[in-house]
Design a protein with these regions (language model features):
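Conserved "landmark" site that anchors the functional core of diverse proteins
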Residues: 274-279, 321-326, 492-494, 501-507, ...
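Conserved small-residue hotspots that stabilize compact domain segments
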Residues: 302-303, 327, 331, 335-358
Length: 646
C-alpha cells in the first residue's frame, strides 16, 4: 500500500493543543489503545489535515481516540488515529481491498457512500452484512466503476457523529476533464462533546431542546408590524396548533456543536496554499450528522463543476448550500497575493466552520459576519399562496401485495428506533414492467452496473423520442396521508422548488446555486422512460420526534421492491417543515430538473419543506439497499426503508 504523508504502520496525527490527549493522568488509557506511540502535541492553533492513502490495498483500524476540539476532553471514534479519517484515493478501473480492523468494544462498520458496488460490500449492518465485531477484521473488495468526490462513514448507531467519517476521492482512469492546478479536500462535520445517545434522548423528550432562538414577544410585535396584527395572530395560532416553531431550523445546533473543517475548529484556521492565478479545485464534502452548510469564499467566485461525484456544466456562483452527505467540486482562481476565507455557516446561523486560502502560511482574511437567522413561514408548511397542487388532487392507485420472505429487510438496523403504531403500506414491483436483462447488471458474481456518464460513455439505451420521460404516471402504491400520531400535519399545497436556493438564501444579494442550475456534462446512459412511479411522503411528528415515510417508521414498513433492470420514477413529497437529504444506496438518482437527457446524477437529494421532487432510478444492481434520510437522528427515529432489487 502506498501511503502519502504516512509510513506503513504509523498514524498521522499532527494535532494542536485543542486536540491533545488527556495528559499524564490518561497515560494508561492511551497505552491501552495501542497506537504504537504515535501521539503528537502541538501549539494552540496549529492546523491538522488527515493523512492521504492511495493505492489498491488499504488497512484501516477503528478505535477510540481522546480529543479536545472545544476546550473539553472527549472521546472520538477514529480511523487510523484521525478524525476525520484518512483521505482515501482510489482509481477508476481498479479493484481495491480495504481491510478494516475493529478495536472498539462494540461492533462497527464502514459504508462507502454512493460507491457502486456489490450489495454485500455496502457496509450496512443487518442489511448487507453482519457488521464488524470487536477484535475482528472485515475485508471489503470493491471493483471501482466510477470517479469523483465521495466519502465514507460508519453505519453503526451514532459512530458517524463521534468521528467515524472520511473523504474518498476516485480518480478518473482517463485524463480528468476538469482543468485545475492544485486541489484540496474541504471536509465539513459537526462535532459534539455530548454523547449522541443523550442528544437523541433529549430530542425524543423535547424536539426543540437545542433551539435557543424561540419566538419572543418583541418578535411577535415585529411580525405584526410587517404583515398586520390579524395575519400575525393567525400565523401564531397555526404554528401552535401544529406544535411547531418557525425558529426551529435545525434539530441540533451550535448550542452543542462545534463546526469543523478538515478536523479543525475555527480558531485552528486550516490553510490551503496557492500561487496567484492558479485554478484551485476545492472538493467540498458535507460529512456532518445534522447540519446543512452555506458555503462562500468572500472575494472569489466559485465555478461548480461537479455534484455528487458527477460532472456538471460549469456554473459560477457566490454561494451554495450543501446538504448532509452531498459533495460539490468547485474551481476558484485567486489573482491577488492575499488571503481568502472559506466560510461555512450552518442554516440556523448558530456558528461556523472556517478555513483559509493563502499564498503563505500564517496569513488570514476577515471572517464575514453570519447572515440573519432564517425563519420558517407558512409557505414552508404548504399553507401559503403558492398555486401548487393540493394534497387531495394527488394521484393514487390500488395496493399491491408484497413478496414474502423479506424479513431480513425489516429487522432492527444497528440499534435503530423501531417502534411503530400505524397501518402498513407496501411498495412492490410490477412483474410486467419493461426491464433489461443480461446488460450490465451488477452483482457479486462479477457483472457490473451501468457505467457512470463520462466523456467516453455511450448511452446503453438510446433516449426515447416517442415517450416523454418526465410525463406523469399513476403511482403503483397507495398513499393516503392523514394526521395522526406519526403525521402531525399534511400540507394543503406542495410545489416544485428547484429554483429556490433554500430558506435564508433568497434575496441575500449573492448568486446562489439551485438544483435547477445543475445540468449534467454528459448524457445519461439509460434513455428509457420510467414504467411506473413510487410516491413517498416524508412525514413526521416533531413534538414526539418520530420520522418516517408515508407515516410509517422503519419497523412497520414493507420493503420497496424493484425488479432487476426496470426503470422507475421516485416521487418524494415533503409533508414536514424541515429539509431532508434523502439517500438511496447502490443506485444513482437522476434528478428531474428539466434538463432531459442531461438531468444530473445524484446520490443524495435535498427535499425542501412542502416540496415535490422526482428522480429516475435504473435498478441495475441486485441486493438489499438502504434508503433513508441522512439526518442521522431522523434515520434512527424511523425515516428509513429498504429497497430490494431482485
Amino acid at each position: 500500500m502506498h501511503e502519502e504523508k504516512q509510513g506503513k504502520g504509523r498514524c498521522f496525527l499532527p494535532i494542536s493543543r485543542r486536540r491533545f490527549v488527556q495528559g499524564l493522568a490518561a497515560g494508561g488509557a492511551v497505552a491501552a489503545l495501542d497506537w504504537g506511540g504515535c501521539l503528537a502535541f502541538g501549539e494552540t492553533g496549529q492546523q491538522q489535515t488527515p493523512a492521504t492513502l492511495a493505492g489498491k490495498n488499504f488497512e484501516l483500524t477503528i478505535d477510540s481516540l481522546p480529543v479536545n476540539f472545544t476546550g473539553r476532553h472527549s472521546v472520538a471514534t477514529a480511523v487510523n488515529g484521525s478524525v476525520p479519517g484518512p483521505i482515501l484515493r482510489w482509481r477508476e478501473g481498479d479493484t481495491v481491498t480495504v481491510a478494516v480492523t475493529n478495536r472498539l468494544k462494540v461492533p462497527t462498520s464502514i459504508h462507502w457512500h454512493a460507491i457502486r458496488l456489490p450489495a454485500d460490500m455496502d457496509g450496512v449492518p443487518g442489511l448487507s452484512f453482519p457488521g464488524i465485531a470487536p477484535g475482528k477484521t472485515f475485508v471489503y473488495r470493491i471493483p471501482v466503476v466510477q470517479s469523483g468526490t465521495y466519502w465514507y462513514h460508519s453505519h453503526s448507531r451514532f459512530q458517524e457523529q463521534t468521528g467515524l467519517v472520511g473523504a474518498l476521492i476516485v480518480e478518473r482512469r482517463e485524463k480528468d476533464s476538469i482543468d485545475f492546478d492544485r486541489e484540496y479536500v474541504v471536509f465539513l462535520c459537526d462535532w459534539t462533546d455530548t454523547n449522541p445517545e443523550t442528544i437523541f434522548s433529549n430530542l425524543k423528550q423535547q424536539s426543540d431542546y437545542y433551539n435557543y432562538h424561540k419566538l419572543t414577544v418583541p418578535n411577535f410585535f415585529s411580525e405584526a408590524k410587517k404583515k398586520g396584527l390579524r395575519p400575525a395572530i393567525s400565523d401564531h395560532l397555526a404554528w401552535a396548533r401544529m406544535n411547531m416553531s418557525p425558529t426551529d431550523i435545525s434539530d441540533v445546533s451550535g448550542a452543542t456543536y462545534t463546526y469543523l473543517l478538515n478536523g479543525n475548529a475555527p480558531a485552528a484556521n486550516w490553510t490551503g496554499l496557492f500561487q496567484p492565478g492558479e485554478r484551485i479545485r476545492l472538493r467540498f464534502i458535507n460529512g456532518s450528522s445534522m447540519t446543512f452548510f452555506d458555503i462562500r469564499v468572500p472575494g472569489l467566485q466559485m465555478t461548480v463543476v461537479q455534484a455528487d461525484g458527477n460532472d456538471v456544466e460549469p456554473v459560477t456562483v457566490d454561494e451554495f448550500r450543501i446538504g448532509i452527505a452531498e459533495t460539490y467540486d468547485v474551481i476558484v482562481q485567486p489573482q491577488d497575493d492575499t488571503a481568502y476565507t472559506i466560510f461555512a455557516q450552518p442554516e440556523d446561523r448558530s456558528g461556523y466552520a472556517r478555513g483559509t486560502l493563502a499564498p503563505k502560511m500564517g496569513m488570514t482574511a476577515a471572517v464575514p459576519p453570519m447572515d440573519p437567522r432564517p425563519m420558517r413561514t407558512m409557505v414552508d408548511m404548504g399553507m401559503g399562496n403558492m398555486g401548487g397542487m393540493k394534497m387531495g388532487d394527488m394521484p393514487t392507485s390500488s395496493k399491491n401485495a408484497a413478496t414474502p420472505g423479506m424479513n431480513m429487510a425489516r429487522q432492527s438496523m444497528a440499534g435503530m428506533d423501531t417502534g411503530s403504531d400505524s397501518a402498513e403500506h407496501r411498495e412492490t414491483g410490477d412483474q410486467n414492467q419493461q426491464t433489461i436483462t443480461g446488460m450490465g447488471m451488477g452483482n457479486s458474481t462479477g457483472r457490473t452496473p451501468f457505467p457512470q456518464p463520462g466523456p467516453s460513455t455511450m448511452p446503453i439505451m438510446p433516449v426515447s423520442r416517442t415517450a416523454n420521460a418526465e410525463a406523469k404516471l399513476k403511482p403503483s402504491n397507495p398513499v393516503h396521508m392523514h394526521v395522526g400520531p406519526q403525521v402531525v400535519s399534511v400540507p394543503m399545497q406542495v410545489r416544485e422548488r428547484l429554483n429556490d436556493p433554500g430558506d435564508g438564501l433568497s434575496g441575500n444579494g449573492r448568486r446562489v446555486l439551485t438544483y435547477a442550475d445543475l445540468r449534467a456534462r454528459y448524457r445519461g446512459v439509460d434513455g428509457r422512460p420510467p414504467t411506473r412511479e413510487i410516491e413517498l411522503h416524508l412525514s413526521g411528528n416533531m413534538e414526539r420526534y418520530i420520522w418516517g415515510f408515508n407515516g410509517q417508521k422503519f419497523s412497520s414498513a414493507e420493503p420497496i421492491e424493484l425488479k432487476l433492470g426496470e426503470r422507475v420514477r421516485f416521487v418524494l413529497i415533503n409533508d414536514t417543515m424541515m429539509e431532508h437529504p434523502i439517500h438511496l444506496h447502490g443506485l444513482w438518482s437522476e434528478l428531474e430538473n428539466g434538463h432531459g437527457e442531461f438531468n444530473p446524477y445524484k446520490h443524495t437529494i435535498i427535499v425542501k419543506p412542502a416540496e415535490r421532487v422526482s428522480y429516475l432510478v435504473s435498478a441495475d444492481t441486485p441486493g438489499h439497499w438502504a434508503y433513508h434520510c441522512h439526518l442521522l437522528y431522523h434515520m434512527h427515529a424511523g425515516m428509513f426503508r429498504t429497497v430490494v432489487v431482485s
